Amino acid sequence: MALFRNGNGIAWARRRALVWALFALAFCAAMNIYHYSLQGARGLYLWDKTWLFRILILMGLLPLGLLALSLPLEKIKTKAPSKLLRGFSLVSSFLVSLASLGILAFLIAAPRMGELRKADLNLIDPSIKLESSSRLYDDQEMLLRLSVGSDAHWGTEKTDSNARSNILATIAENKPDLFFLLGDTVETGSSVSQWNAALSDLSAIVPKVPLRPLMGNHDALFGGQYLFKKAFFPEAFSSDSGSPYYYSIETKVATLVALNLPWGTENFDRKQRTWLEEVLKTADPLKPIIVFSHSYFYASGYDDPDLDKPWYDHYQNIPALTPIFERYGVDLVVSGHNHYMEFLEHNEVRYAIVGAMGSKSDPVPAHVSPASKWIAVATFGHVNINITKDYIVVEFKDQLGKTLHEERIRYLPSLESGSNERSPQA
């Protein structure tokens, strides 16, 4: 072991450089392990400026690499090149250690700095059966009334705050049984001030509306899950999945399922998949099934030059989840993430995109999904979902409550005689 040979200054210099390089590697590993344990971090790596996150992963190897390069140079007569590389190794060890500890401290401390305001909200505990209030709709009794919005993005100047407030006021006037907020509530999840701005507006405009938010990719940024749970999932709450990020909500007339898909399938692990299939399999065959998520499935869109990714017909979500929806007869899937409003249909499953709650619209679609039936671009709004005994009525509303488009989905139960389970479709 020449690296640890005692009795000369070179061996001691090697040992010192190696120890510091190992410290740097350990600090870098600890930072990355913590970062990628956070919600949405793996999706951030795959979808947004991947070169930066690859540098953060690989920078811990730089000091060791420089030290390894110095070893062959010790055989030449002049020792200056090897000393120089060892010096660079020591300097890089210090810088990598400092950067790793700084990033780790930021990820831990940022979402915990400042005080989250107490909000006057009617938050719904997913573990409690949802009661509904009936109302007549075109001479039919509405058994359950839902409102859905997504991508409000409090905290950025790219959002139209007036449109957002108008949408909330329209929802408050509608008095739904439940308002689903499908994520990207804030621009940067670790920012307490942005969450406080969101909570302030929600408390002022929809304090009495039963509310159930999902977590989007922006909500999760840099440890934002801590503030999301503190704001929207108190310690007294629970869910059938054991997670605050995905669950089903029991109602008398429908099965409501919330998924944890901030970016794509990065969080769709075996546990969530098994839970989802069990929920769908055992759902009451006489009730419609409506699934909610942040990221979309079928959707029109464009090729994002900044991310170098297709922002349409989601290449992860479609193969991983749509066969499950089709197998168990899901009636409607509602998502955000894409800043349009759109209605689509594929293999008898309907999809609604509602990411238009005030945030800057995505560009005019360069790719129109073959599943698309209707789309509104550069139009702010939300969706109302009214369930009657025969239909799911999907109403796309603009920011002032005007109906832009309506779809009636007749839900047909998939029954097996004597069974209370949905039979998977062939």
What do the PLM-derived regions correspond to, one by one?
Residues P176-F179, V330:
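Proline-aspartate-enriched helix->loop->beta-strand connector
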Residues M1-T159, S165-D177, S203, K208, ...:
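Acidic, histidine-bearing metal-coordination/catalytic regions of metal-dependent phosphoesterases
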Residues L178, D219, F297-A299, K360:
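Feature marks short, surface-exposed loop/turn motifs that line or immediately flank catalytic pockets
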Residues L146-V148, F179-L181, P213, V291, ...:
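Residue-level marker for buried hydrophobic side chains located in beta-strands
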Residues D151, G183-D184, G216-N217, H294, ...:
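Active-site glycine-centered loops adjacent to acidic/histidine catalytic or metal-binding residues
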Residues W154, V186-E187, D219, T255, ...:
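Short active-site segment of divalent metal-dependent hydrolases/proteases
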Residues A110-D138, V192-I289, D304-L332, Y340-T388:
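Extended active-site neighborhood of metal-dependent phosphoesterases/phosphodiesterases
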Residues G155-S161, E187-S193, G264-F268:
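Acidic-and-aromatic substrate-binding clefts and catalytic sites of carbohydrate-active enzymes
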